[in-house]
């Protein structure tokens, strides 16, 4: 049986393309890190409050 040869550079080229794509998207969106931390904090507080409300309703 003949062996199939793999192209060596495809994976690296694809990875570099993905990094460039996400860098471009990140530049367009511009979300401040404080907003991300604030949203995560608010979501965790809401989750705890909802859990307490559901436990109290039982």
Curated annotation (Swiss-Prot):
Segments in the Extracellular topological domain: 55-58
Protein name: Preprotein translocase subunit SecG
InterPro entries to which the protein is assigned, alphabetical: Preprot_translocase_SecG, SecG/Sec61-beta/Sbh
Transmembrane portions of the chain: 33-54
One GO CC annotation: plasma membrane
Assembly and binders: Component of the protein translocase complex. Heterotrimer consisting of alpha (SecY), beta (SecG) and gamma (SecE) subunits. Can form oligomers of the heterotrimer.
Similarity field: Belongs to the SEC61-beta family.
A GO biological-process term: protein transport
Entry function: Involved in protein export. The function of the beta subunit is unknown, but it may be involved in stabilization of the trimeric complex.
The entry's keywords: Cell membrane, Membrane, Protein transport, Translocation, Transmembrane, Transmembrane helix, Transport
Cytoplasmic topological intervals: 1-32
Superkingdom, natural source: Archaea
Pfam families: Sec61_beta
Membrane-protein topology: Single-pass membrane protein
Location(s), subcellular: Cell membrane
């Amino acid at each position: 049986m003949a062996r199939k040869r793999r192209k060596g550079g495809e994976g690296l080229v694809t990875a570099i393309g993905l990094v460039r794509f996400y860098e471009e998207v990140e530049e367009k969106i511009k979300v401040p890190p404080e907003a991300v931390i604030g949203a995560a904090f608010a979501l965790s507080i809401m989750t705890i409050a909802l859990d307490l409300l559901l436990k109290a309703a039982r």
